[in-house]
Amino acid sequence: MADQARSEQHVREFARACVRAGLLDDAALHDEVRQAVTADLPDRADVAGELAAAWIDEAREELRVDQESWPEATDYERLQSAFAEVELADVEVLQGCDDHWAAKALLDERAGAGTTPRGVAWFTPADVWHAVDEGMLEVNLWHGTTANAAPGDALLEDVLGVLEKHGLTARFDEGRIEVDAHWHKRIAP
């Protein structure tokens, strides 16, 4: 019974993280949570769709209540402004992409079109989930050649400067940019 309760809590937390990340449309969100119910709670697979809908609604209501206490400008909004500015400097930003292969595919596509970007910044849904609860978003940064950014690179310094300009503290550590930011993405009231 304790394992069942832990599994249910795990799926509920997954639903909460997905809702707060805001990376999926309604249908994809429901499908992800339904699949998690089916996989983690197989004895409740026959009601997986209903449980997914209920737990998503519960997570959305919790988010609506929480966002009332957020400041006027959240870290998420500052991140979006910073990412828009970074993109103006020919650095693509992939938010919530599947993995490094998505960044590689983007760079290959742009290179094939003769428009290799200066770089690409990317992070996965798991990185967003970490920022939802822990207040740190880890961002990968590659040059347009797929080479990792490194200390002393103008690309890295420029991206760090843009983040700082938008009120975000960031540092390069172990191959990634660590941004002190809570992913507080608002949903409609």
Where are these regions (language model features)?
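Long, contiguous N-terminal structural blocks used for assembly/anchoring
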Residues: 1-97
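Short, charged low-complexity intrinsically disordered segments located at boundaries
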Residues: 44-46, 114-115, 189
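A broad, low-specificity signal for short, low-complexity segments enriched in glycine/proline
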Residues: 54-56, 101, 188
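Glycine-rich, often proline-containing surface loops adjacent to acidic residues and nearby aromatics
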Residues: 58-64, 132-143
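Short linear motifs at secondary-structure transitions and domain/linker junctions
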Residues: 67-70, 112-118, 154-157
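An N-terminal amphipathic alpha-helical segment
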Residues: 95-138
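Acidic, proline/glycine-rich low-complexity IDRs
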Residues: 138-189
